[in-house]
Amino acid sequence: MSLHRSFRKGGTRLAAVAAAALLSGCLSDGDVATKDPSFYRSMAASGAQVDAATAASMISGYRKNNGLPPVTVDPELMKLAQAQAQGMASNDKLSHDIIRSFHDRLKGGGYRAYTAAENVGAGYHTLAEAFSGWRDSPPHRANMLLDGATRMGIAAAYSPKSKYKVFWALILAKPDDRKVANAM
C-alpha cells in the first residue's frame, strides 16, 4: 500500500475530526486562550521571570545531543544568576564583572564548585532567543557544553530605559559537595 493511498483513506476521517473540533470551538461558552510556550514568553516586562525548568530542559536536551549529562536547577545558582542579571540591568551594561568577578561572586555566595562557567547576554527578549544566541556563539556554546556540569541557574532582568531591555545570566557548574572540615 502506498503512502499516498493511505493518506487518502484516512483523509475523510481526519477532515471529520477537524470539522468537529472546529465546531466545538464555536459552541464553547468561553474564549480559549492559546498560550505561547514559556520559552517564547517575553522577559521585556516588569516582573517577568524565566521558566527555569524549561531552560534546564532545553539546555539538558542540547547537552544530551552532544553526549553530555543533563543539568538541574540549583537554587543557589539561581540567586547568583539573578544578582548578576539585575546588576547588569541596573548599570545598563553587559559584563561578567559588573558586580565582582565570576569567581569572586561564586565564592562570596558560598558556592563551592569543581568547575563553573557563566554566559551573559543582553537584548534577547525570550529564552528561545537567548538560548539560540548562546548556542550560535562558540565560547557560549562551550560553556553550555561544560564537561561535568550538573547544575544550573538562569535569570533575566528587565530594564525599560535600556536599549537592550533585557539582561541575561546563565551559570552552569559541577558543585563540590565535599564537607569542609571544622577548624578547632
Per-region residue spans from a language model:
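Extracytoplasmic
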Residues: V50, L68, E76, A83, ...
